[in-house]
Curated annotation (Swiss-Prot):
The keyword Metal-binding does not apply. Keywords: ATP-binding, Coiled coil, Cytoplasm, Cytoskeleton, Microtubule, Motor protein, Nucleotide-binding. ATP binds at residues 87-94, 237-244. GO terms for molecular function: ATP binding; microtubule binding; microtubule motor activity. Composed of three structural domains: a large globular N-terminal domain which is responsible for the motor activity of kinesin (it hydrolyzes ATP and binds microtubule), a central alpha-helical coiled coil domain that mediates the heavy chain dimerization; and a small globular C-terminal domain which interacts with other proteins (such as the kinesin light chains), vesicles and membranous organelles. Residues 6-329 form the Kinesin motor domain. Belongs to the TRAFAC class myosin-kinesin ATPase superfamily. Kinesin family. Kinesin subfamily. This is Kinesin heavy chain. GO terms for biological process: microtubule-based movement.
Length: 931
């Protein structure tokens, strides 16, 4: 079941690209046949022979038909297969493997054509064979295995077990049932692959990609099963930094790529030189994964992609030499098959027969040995017949066949990480015992897991370190900005503080000024109250003085009435005199007119005229009296002024005595002053009495004179009566003069009477005051009591002043304390409001944190679901369609009644039918469906 075969090597040359043409590159490759090419470069010249050589004008279909179609048939027959694409960067490896577009019939590459060929072969196979197809997609980037279908798994470990061989632990495998599903997997994985632009390739692959297709087939009639695994490897190209211009991360990627390719070359050299006892598969994860493809259980095809230009002649020669070395590798491929029950029964019968033969042979040998040990000689004819060499060899071969571990099938284990691989045939290995090898593999797997874990931790630590450095740089920049802003704000704050201090100082000054104004206002208010009280007192005293003045005026009026009554010259008499004089003048005029006309005058009229003349005589007497009083009015006024001055002096002395505290030594002085004043007043009054007597004598003389004058006037009137015409006007004039004189005399008389009355009243008041002073000066006990009360009053006044000052000071302190209390309350309120705002902000932040944590958890779940499921836009989802549920495919070539291959449309139709019927979402296999 195993066969030794060499690696198939195919060379492909691409046309010159734009970079090579611009650099002056020329073709240096010539093709001598379908399998030979000749290179003529400056460094070396020579011919290279491979299984097939394709020139620059070859098509994708030609390469597939010659190189790959047979590999697909081998996979379906139960062999393992591998297809390599090797070459320098930009040589066309990805184009060869994937093509320009997987939906383009002409431009698509090897992998899409392999997929179509696999499903076409399944459809053309007998209907008794059931197939399951699984795919996985990974890349080796920076010596880390990354699952392209679950990109979050970026550091998967490589394990090796006795029954499973080498596999990648944790690699996602997806069951597919149609070409479109495989294409969707390829698209998703290709989008996640690491690429970058270099000077030689705008889309240079920065990793080795490995697309694995595992096909398991089972004959439903006989129960036999076979499995095949196909590795489709797109290697990253070797690079020269001088040509690619790689730098930074691209340069690090180039280093890792060249290192892994060097490890691949070392493995090929060790396999082909025939001298190496150790094959360095573990030097690189690429060679570790492809261990069975290089000298193991696999049929391998190597496609070397080369440039025909002289610009890359060194790289082309290196690639061709690599292909020549790889062509010398010998693989031992065998079918990965599981025996059917009938075959197992046949093997069991053979084993049972062999066991019977061995048991009889062992028993005969044991009997012979016992006889020999007993010292007996066994006859030669009784010796045990030895088994023939062919029989022994056949028995050993059968034993190896029977003890060969079978390839695990998906029927028994549908959740295996990678397909099982049977024992490798002839792969160089360490000379270890069976138990030691198992322990070594177990220990190696543990170490690989630890290495992967440590690498993941190191990668995460490096990532955190980069993020921390970026954050540190950002924080430094932010810190510098914040420092500058802080300095600016500090300057502004200092300015604001100065302004605040200035405003505070001004506020304090204004407050002090306001307090001073308040104090002044309070003092003025107090003074105003005192003035109001004084005004009230003055009003009261004014009322009292007004009452006294009214009383004085009343007394004055009474005395004036009495004095004027003695003269009997009231206003009514005076008016009557005027009336009589006027009537007399009129009567004289009328008599004169009668006498002029010659009429007779009656005697009665003369009598009446006589009476009126007598009255006129009295009026003339009064006029003379008034004239006399006018002559003495000046002396009266001078005397009145002297009396008023003396009265004012006495009142001033009296007020001084009242305002001054009288002591015992002042009483005699007061008495002397009062005696002097009283003596002076008596002298003045006696003088005034003498003057009044003289005035009375003068008045009597004047009265006599006036009487004489009246008599004279009466005589003149009589004479005038006899001659009225001559003296008529003279009388009228005299009457008018008398009238004026009368008025002036009456005014002077009234004024004199008023002065006399006022002097009498002042004299009475002075007497009363004098008597009061005498009474008060005689009471020494009252004076002592008054002095004691005054001293107490002064002490009480001082105490009251101190209390008022203390009260004002306490009021100020209370006001200050109230201000401080108000400010403290305002501060407490502001702090409480700030605390409430802070609590609200903290609650909002906690709420936002909870929401953010929930969103983060949902995002992680969504990422996990998207990476694990890889939902396709066409309605196919790896998760929803059951990517890890086996999808058996029945061959379609057995008859017309064979079921068709499940496709996306069929899956969608089944899902819709299940949804509408309300049945379980678990899809049933058509293997159990009866037509």
């Amino acid at each position: 079941m195993s066969s030794a075969n060499s690696i198939k090597v195919v060379a492909r040359f691409r046309p010159q690209n734009k970079v090579e043409l611009e650099s002056g590159g020329k073709p240096i490759v010539s093709f001598d046949g379908e399998d030979t090419c000749t290179v003529a470069s400056k460094e070396a010249q020579g011919s290279f022979t491979f299984d097939r050589v394709f020139d620059m004008g070859c098509k994708q279909q030609d390469i597939f038909d010659f190189s790959i179609r047979s590999t697909v048939d081998d996979i379906l027959n139960g062999y393992n297969g591998t297809v390599f694409a090797y070459g320098q960067t930009g040589a066309g490896k990805s184009y060869t493997m994937m093509g320009t577009n997987i939906d383009d019939d002409e431009g698509r590459g090897i992998i899409p054509r392999i997929v179509e060929q696999i499903f076409a072969s399944i459809m053309s196979s007998p209907g008794t064979i059931e197939y399951t197809v699984r795919v996985s997609y990974m890349e080796i980037y920076m010596e880390r295995i990354r699952d392209l279908l679950a990109p979050q798994n970026d550091n998967l470990p490589v394990h090796e077990e006795k029954n499973r061989g080498v596999y990648v632990k944790g690699l996602l495998e997806i069951y597919v049932s149609s070409v479109q599903e495989v294409y969707e997997v390829m698209r998703r994985g290709g989008n996640a692959r690491a690429v970058a632009a270099t000077n030689m390739n705008q889309e240079s692959s920065r990793s080795h990609s490995i697309f694995v297709i595992t096909i398991t087939q089972k004959n439903v009639e006989t129960g036999s099963a076979k499995s095949g695994q196909l590795f489709l490897v797109d290697l990253a190209g070797s690079e020269k930094v001088g040509k690619t211009g790689a730098s930074g991360q691209t340069l690090e990627e180039a280093k890792k790529i060249n290192k892994s390719l060097s490890a691949l070359g070392m493995v090929i050299n060790a396999l082909t030189d025939g001298k190496s006892s150790h094959i360095p598969y573990r030097d690189s994860k690429l060679t570790r994964i492809l261990q069975e493809s290089l000298g193991g259980n696999s049929r391998t095809t190597l496609i070397i992609n080369c440039s025909p230009s002289s610009y890359n002649d060194a790289e082309t020669l290196g690639t061709l030499r690599f292909g020549m070395r790889a062509k010398s590798i010998k693989n031992k491929a065998k079918v990965n098959a599981e025996l059917s029950p009938a075959e197992l029964k046949s093997l069991l019968k053979k084993a049972q027969g062999q066991v019977t033969n061995f048991e009889s042979y062992i028993s005969s040998l044991e009997g012979e040995i016992q006889m020999w040990r007993a010292g007996e000689a066994v006859p030669k004819e009784r010796w045990a017949t030895p088994l023939t060499t062919d029989a022994v060899a056949r028995t050993k071969a059968d034993a190896r066949t029977s003890t060969r571990p079978s390839t695990p099938s998906l029927i028994s284990d549908s959740r295996s990480e990678t397909p099982a691989i049977s024992d490798r045939a002839g792969t160089p290995s360490l000379p270890l015992d069976k138990d030691e090898r198992e322990e070594f593999l177990r220990r190696e797997n543990e170490l690989q897991d630890q290495i992967s874990e440590k690498e993941s931790q190191a990668a995460s630590a490096e990532k955190q370190l980069r993020e921390t450095k970026e954050e540190l740089a950002y924080l430094k920049d932010h810190d510098s900005k914040v420092g500058k802003e802080n300095e600016k704000l500090t300057t502004e704050v200092n300015e604001f503080k100065m302004q605040l201090e200035r405003l505070t100082f001004e506020s304090k000054e204004a407050q002090i000024t306001m307090d001073a104004l308040k104090e002044a206002n309070s003092e003025l208010t107090t003074e105003l109250d005192e003035v109001k009280q004084q005004l009230l007192d003055v009003k009261m005293s004014a009322k009292e003085s007004g009452a006294a003045l009214d009383e004085k005026e009343k007394r004055k009026a009474e005395k004036m009435a009495k004095m004027m009554a003695g003269f009997d010259l009231g206003g009514e008499v005076f008016s009557e005199n005027e009336r009589h004089i006027a009537e007399t003048i009129e009567k004289v005029d009328s008599l004169h007119e009668l006498s002029a006309t010659g009429d007779n005058i009656a005697p009665d009229e003369f009598k009446a005229l006589k009476a009126r003349l007598v009255e006129t005589q009295g009026i003339v007497r009064q006029a003379e009296l008034s004239m006399y009083s006018t002559s003495s009015s000046e002396s009266d006024s001078r005397r009145r002024q002297e009396l008023e001055a003396r009265l004012e002096a006495v009142q001033a002395e009296y007020e001084e005595i009242l305002t001054r505290n009288l002591g015992p030594e002042d009483i005699e002085e007061v008495k002397a002053r009062l005696e002097n004043a009283f003596a002076n007043r008596q002298t003045a009054q006696s003088q005034f009495v003498e003057e009044l007597k003289e005035d009375i004598a003068q008045k009597a003389a004047e009265n006599t004179r006036m009487k004489t004058l009246i008599e004279d006037l009466q005589q003149r009137v009589k004479a005038g009566a006899t001659a009225p015409m001559a003296n008529g006007k003279t009388i009228q004039q005299q009457i008018a003069e008398f009238d004026v004189m009368k008025k002036s005399l009456m005014r002077d008389l009234q004024n004199r009477c008023e002065r006399v009355v006022e002097l009498e009243i002042s004299l009475d008041e002075t007497r009363e005051q004098y008597n009061n002073v005498l009474r008060s000066s005689n009471n020494r006990a009252q004076q002592k009591k008054m002095a004691f009360l005054e001293r107490n009053l002064e002490q009480l006044t001082q105490v009251q002043r101190q209390l008022v000052e203390q009260n004002s000071a306490l009021k100020k302190e209370v006001a200050i304390a109230e201000r401080k209390l108000i400010a403290r309350n305002e501060r407490i309120q502001s702090l409480e409001s700030l605390l409430q705002d802070s609590q609200e902000k903290m609650a909002a932040a906690n709420h936002k944190y909870v929401q953010l944590a929930a969103v983060k958890e949902r995002l992680e779940l969504a990422k996990a679901g998207s990476t694990r499921g890889l939902n396709s836009p066409g309605g196919f989802s790896f998760a929803n369609a059951g990517s890890r549920i086996a999808k058996p495919l029945r061959g379609g070539g057995g008859g017309n009644d064979a079921p068709s291959i499940p496709t996306i449309q069929n899956l969608q139709g089944q899902n819709e039918g299940n949804t509408s019927s309300g049945s379980s979402s678990k899809r049933a296999s058509w293997f159990f469906t009866k037509s």
